[in-house]
Amino acid sequence: CLEGVEFRKKAITSHKEEATAAATILGVIERYLEIEEIVGAPSASWTPPAESPFVVREYSDAEHAATRLRGTWNLGNEPIPNLTEFLEERGVKVLRIPFSDNMDGVMCKARKGNGTAVPVIIINEKINGERQRFTLAHELGHLVLDVDKCIDEEKASHRFASAFLMPREVLLSEVGRHRTSISIRELFQIKKMFGVSVQAIAYRCKDLGIFGDSILRGLFKHFNEQGWRRPPYEPMPIDPESPRRFDRLCYRALSEGQVSESKAAELLGISVRNLSERVLQPEDREEPTPA
């Protein structure tokens, strides 16, 4: 049984939007926990990583935290193909729901009756894949970092997200340790590799000292001129990642006879007829998270 939802401080400024999000989250997480119990899947419960929360007293500490977390989770230095899937395997529930345009995502905790908390990252279903992945990593930062009051928590989480998605040594290997110029084509090739925006890549290169402020300003001047900093944003968008674990557990329980068709449809938030059609079809189109 869930008792409520705790959003991180100042995460949502609108009380109405917070109440709507909380109601949606409670409904979905209740069903999520129910299907986990039915199929006996306790392995996806959240266990805080070793050494966390990582103390951040300066922004470079956020970089080190990302490196240590990748090591703890045995990620190596390779890009993460599907961050949504990876986080769900670690016990973080990922939901995609509609939000206002000024909000990409937020992290909260759903409280169980026994006092334990389920971490939930909510992503605005309207955003593109590169913004989604960066937002997921940013909100993961809020979950695992302990940021000193003397520095900006949002900037620290941004630095963490950049380092988590674009490990230092890999980016240096691809781009070089010092550049006096970089082409737009290069940036878009790197975008395909890491699944992040060219703007995030440019900031990351600046943070690592690959190039300085003048090149960064020149790049952002070009981004502005091309209209890439406003909708529909830059070319070659990354496809959004959809949370799939909940659906898989429901179809698994149905196949194993652990739930009836009507119960599976209820959990998925669809009609029995729709369920019967989906069971026989490949998962070839994006399906929204049930509301």
Which role fits each region the language model picked out?
Residues 1-291:
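Short juxta-domain linker segments that transition from a proline/glycine-rich
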